[in-house]
């Protein structure tokens, strides 16, 4: 009997191969934390379709643990960093952004972050150098005959490995600062007149002053990106490939861009055919809760429950903040499930339970859930959108301020400032979102939009990877603008030529006019003299 089942599974896997073409070999250059959580879902689906997936992993890692999944093949290469060093860096990064950075404009706080961003760039550059300079490691990759490289664009190197292996590659990306990578490499347009820049904190229809702010942010990040790549990355790529090149030129060869967002969160803007928005690909129907959690949820009666989580990267909330939150939660009639890994606050109410981990998606999909208190991470926001749950946003770092600003603009959330938050601020926000049907109505509207797609985001992501493998690329979808220098892309040479033509025409017309004028004036004077 077991032999028949094994044969059936093998036949099923073979059928997947025939359905999508030949089973391929996918090489992956991933990133940590939520980046890995999202990309892993795509990789596991590829394995289910019969493809062989190999994940490149530095010896220093936080989330890239082979023990968590047996379906993926991991290849580890040595690095000079330790996992402890890496975790300390990310913890320091989160703490600086959460507690220290000014929040006035993107210019003020990003200047403070410059050293941290440079440190992250140096880490990525060192890891990349250690990977591509490892001859044994690169020879092994060459001999494996991979069909495609799937990389996270926020951590450069996957495209360099693809170039060295001479195979196509495609990107997964949530965002880059100021959308610089998407704009100048991916060819995605973000007109600052109506599209709020990431890290600007703006959303929706902008006023004149907000458009000025948005334009300044765009110009700043444009300049920042140029200096970011020109200082170290461009010389390294040129040296490695043995020819003059740039990071932007190599990244621009990406066949497809799979952006981990969607139009229920984003605001509309032009995109190219080789860009697809796959936000919420990790969302699934809610599963039954563990018995102890289900019993607690059911004990809430008609009032329902509130789910509270500020993510996996926040671990050292101050005692003062914890007490403010606990007191506010204690005042509402709902039961509260709070993901919190710290000392129990003295003000914690009997309606609130602390958990080091929560089945967040399953709780958000429970019919008794009334609201979700979130830091604004994209994964949590998409789970809330998926299940139609209104939010109280307490953004902490990175793009979370923008995510919550977008949800506020769409009427599905209320924002609370983490640094200045008082007991009454949080309590008022909770009562507003729970008691006002306006927020639930808009959350359900976004949920309807999210579910009403021709194909599921995960299926589209897998399709495009298989598409690139089947056709050895997708160059017919790439904009020809990738082949143009910046002055041609913006038609500055054409504008200059047309202006020159106008100028020459005007000059010739003036000269003709002056010639005619002088001719008749002289003739008239001559006639008078006679």
From Swiss-Prot:
GO molecular function: glucuronosyltransferase activity
SUPFAM superfamilies for this protein: UDP-Glycosyltransferase/glycogen phosphorylase
Database matches in InterPro entries: UDP-glycosyltransferase, UDP_glucos_trans, UDP_glycos_trans_CS
Post-translational modification: N-glycosylated.
Substrates-to-products reaction catalysed: glucuronate acceptor + UDP-alpha-D-glucuronate = acceptor beta-D-glucuronoside + UDP + H(+); 17alpha-estradiol + UDP-alpha-D-glucuronate = 17alpha-estradiol 3-O-(beta-D-glucuronate) + UDP + H(+); 16alpha,17alpha-estriol + UDP-alpha-D-glucuronate = 16alpha,17alpha-estriol 3-O-(beta-D-glucuronate) + UDP + H(+); 17beta-hydroxy-5alpha-androstan-3-one + UDP-alpha-D-glucuronate = 5alpha-dihydrotestosterone 17-O-(beta-D-glucuronate) + UDP + H(+)
Key words, A-Z: Endoplasmic reticulum, Glycoprotein, Glycosyltransferase, Lipid metabolism, Membrane, Signal, Steroid metabolism, Transferase, Transmembrane, Transmembrane helix
Entries under Gene3D superfamilies matching the protein: Glycogen Phosphorylase B
Signal peptide limits: 1-23
Residues the record marks as carrying a glycan: 316
Keyword Transmembrane recorded: yes
Tissues expressing the protein: Liver. Lower levels seen in the kidney and testis.
EC code: 2.4.1.17
Bilayer-crossing regions: 494-510
One of the protein's GO biological processes: estrogen metabolic process
GO CC aspect terms: endoplasmic reticulum membrane
Primary localization: endoplasmic reticulum
Induction remark: By phenobarbital.
Membrane topology: Single-pass membrane protein
Localisation per UniProt entry: Endoplasmic reticulum membrane
Signal as UniProt keyword: yes
Primary role: UDP-glucuronosyltransferase (UGT) that catalyzes phase II biotransformation reactions in which lipophilic substrates are conjugated with glucuronic acid to increase the metabolite's water solubility, thereby facilitating excretion into either the urine or bile. Essential for the elimination and detoxification of drugs, xenobiotics and endogenous compounds. Catalyzes the glucuronidation of endogenous steroid hormones such as androgens (testosterone, androsterone) and estrogens (estradiol, epiestradiol, estriol, catechol estrogens).
Family: Belongs to the UDP-glycosyltransferase family.
Protein name: UDP-glucuronosyltransferase 2B15
